[in-house]
Each structure stands twice: as structure tokens, then as C-alpha cells.
Amino acid sequence: MSQQKLSIQLNCPLPKLDFDVITLGHGSGGVLTHRLLDTGVFNVLKNDLLNEQHDGAILNFSGPVAFTTDSYVVTPIFFPGGNIGELAVNGSINDLAMCGAIPEYLSLSFILEEGLRMEEFWEVLLGIKKASEEAGVSIVTGDTKVVDKGKGDKVFIN
């Protein structure tokens, strides 16, 4: 009997990093999360405090401080005159203004649904940038989570 030598090569492929949609991996805290934040959030909303990439922000104030939180869950996420990103920024700024405060800083958290088109996420980010620049506020911290398809409504913002 003749023996045949089998040549098997095992290769570990590089992970896929370019996606057309949000995947569960984008919320895992790993490579995909960091890529989404670096190319998306940090790149679009860049400022010195956000660029520190901490889970919080350290701010110095000499007088009273007003703060608020609000969550935005709207369908559709794009509507005549804006999108959920602009609504979230302007709504939070309005809440602070109703306290008599002059808004300077905001936090920003996303709950993204698996399958959200990356193009839609970018459009929401650009709406956030536009609204925050118009109001003169900086996004200084935030969080991003991804939920299974069918467990959210594209994007929730706090």
C-alpha cells in the first residue's frame, strides 16, 4: 500500500472589519466596538475631553451645575427636518435651558439594534454633530450597546 502525504495548512483569517450594518460584535467591547467608536463617534464628534476616551468625563466648575438625562425612542428615526440624533441633542439642551442653565456639555449613549445600516448610524452621528455645534455644546462621554435584531427599534439615544 502506498501512503499519501496530506498537506494541510491552517490559516486564521483576519477578522472582517468593514460592515454595511451594525452587528452584535460592534457592542462586544472588542475590536469592532473600538473601530466603530474610532472611525465614527470619536472622529465625528471630536473634542479634547471626548478624545480622552474614558468611561466618564472630569469637568471643573466654580458654581452651581445643572444636569439632565433623557431618552429618545422615535419611529421613524429620520423625519422631515431632522433625525433622532438632532432631537436628542436639542431635547436635552431644552431640558437644561428650562432649568435656567447655559448648556455646555452632554453625555451620549446609544443602544443600537443589530442590522442598523451603517449609513443610517453615520447620518444620526452627523445630526448630533450639527445640533451640538449649533448649540455650542460638547459631547464629553458616552456608551454604546448593541441588542439583538428585533429587540430595539434601530437606535435609542440617551
Please place each PLM-identified region on the residue numbering.
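N-terminal amphipathic/basic leader segments beginning at the initiator methionine
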Residues: M1-G40
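Glycine-rich phosphate/pyrophosphate-binding loop regions near the starts of catalytic domains
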Residues: T23, V31-N158
